[in-house]
Regions:
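N-terminal glycine-/charge-rich "phosphate-binding" loop or analogous flexible N-terminal tail
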Residues: 1-43
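Rossmann-like adenosine-cofactor binding region
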Residues: 169-263
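A charged, well-structured terminal subsegment
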Residues: 102-130, 283-284, 288-291, 295
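Short acidic low-complexity segments
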Residues: 31-42, 53-56, 175-190
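NAD(P)-binding Rossmann-fold cofactor-contacting core
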Residues: 157-174
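Rossmann-like dinucleotide-binding domain for NAD(H)/NADP(H)
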Residues: 225-312
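Glycine-rich NAD(P)-binding loop of Rossmann-like domains
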Residues: 117-150
Length: 312
């Protein structure tokens, strides 16, 4: 009988059975095990979301790690990552499409004054606000990577004036793209609705702070689907309380789950989402994970390799 191919699995989001079922048709003989099982000591690959510090280094025969997300801060930030390991991330078209759906929903909530109308409904108040024109509403997408570029292009189909920012120069049809520090400031000052899909790196931690909120248009809306640690939460609350920003929709927080006593929950200008804008789907991502497992075990560089120095 052939020995199973043991792969270490760790995630708080999906039960191990979900990924086992997704990978079975693609890799017959594969067996997912947890890091505390004896078989894990012989495993060459780990697939993971948010592993505890020391877990990766404790597995002596690992050749590589696969992040069960596009972001990789959950593996790298504040944790030891052995330099000899290969490291791949997911770039799943489903996740890009899901993020585009969620951002479109939240952008339209602000564009069409949904919160105002819902509040009026509770008061049985038949009000009608002046309409906005999408072409005269500037939406800035901060982060134009694999997901952000799809989000930006999707918003152009609704005729919004879409601008975007990334660290390096990009070109996206219908989107005015900026880069560098000056470009970042231009997006802040220009956007009616600002959407962050930035990765969490040393350069982006706390990037949305009092200084940058003050540079945004008065009455602008802020949407964050990047990472919670990019926002100085007290500064955001202050910008909302001073009526500089009209509202904030947040899918990511500094601490997740968001503590029950956190002021975001009851703030009238904050919409809280539980990090569901673009969840990893084993069915759609299974092929990519199987391919990365095969490449790592064979000693090849996997597709969508992570540049550890850059953090993405």
């Amino acid at each position: 009988m052939t020995e199973p191919i043991y792969i270490v699995y760790h995630s708080v989001d999906h039960k191990i059975e979900f990924w086992q079922d997704a990978l079975n048709p693609l890799m017959p003989g594969i067996k997912l095990v947890t890091a505390d099982q004896p078989e894990a000591q012989n495993a060459e690959v780990m697939i993971t979301w948010n592993p505890p510090e020391g877990m990766i280094a404790s597995l002596p025969n690992l050749k590589g790690v696969i992040s069960l997300a596009q972001g990789v801060d959950h593996v790298l930030n504040g944790k030891t990552f052995p330099s000899h390991l290969k490291f791949a991330r997911l770039i799943d078209p489903y996740m890009s499409e899901a993020m585009a759906e969620w951002v479109t929903l939240t952008v339209l909530e602000y564009h069409r004054d949904a919160a105002t109308y819902r509040d009026a409904e509770t008061r049985h108040d038949w009000i009608r606000l002046p309409p906005r024109i999408a072409a005269r509403t500037t939406v800035a997408v901060m982060g134009l990577g694999a997901i952000g570029s799809v989000v930006a292009e999707t918003l152009t189909h609704l005729k919004f004036d879409v601008i975007g920012w990334s660290r390096s120069e990009k070109s996206i049809p219908g989107v005015t793209c900026y880069h560098g520090d000056d470009g970042f400031e231009t997006c802040l000052k220009t956007a009616d609705i600002l959407v962050s899909i930035l990765p969490l790196t040393a350069a982006t931690e706390n990037i949305f702070n009092a200084k940058h909120f003050a540079q945004m248009k008065k009455g602008a809306a802020f949407i964050n689907a990047g990472r919670g640690k990019q926002v100085v939460e007290a500064d955001l609350i202050n910008a909302l309380d001073q009526d500089h920003l009209r509202g904030a929709t947040l899918d990511v927080m500094v601490i997740e789950p968001l503590p029950a006593d956190h002021p975001f929950w009851d703030h009238p200008k904050v919409n809280v989402w539980p990090h569901v804008s673009a969840q990893t789907n084993p069915e759609s991502a299974g092929e990519q994970v199987a391919e990365a497992i095969t490449d790592i075990r064979a000693g090849r560089e996997p597709r969508n390799s992570v540049n550890i120095a850059r953090g993405y």
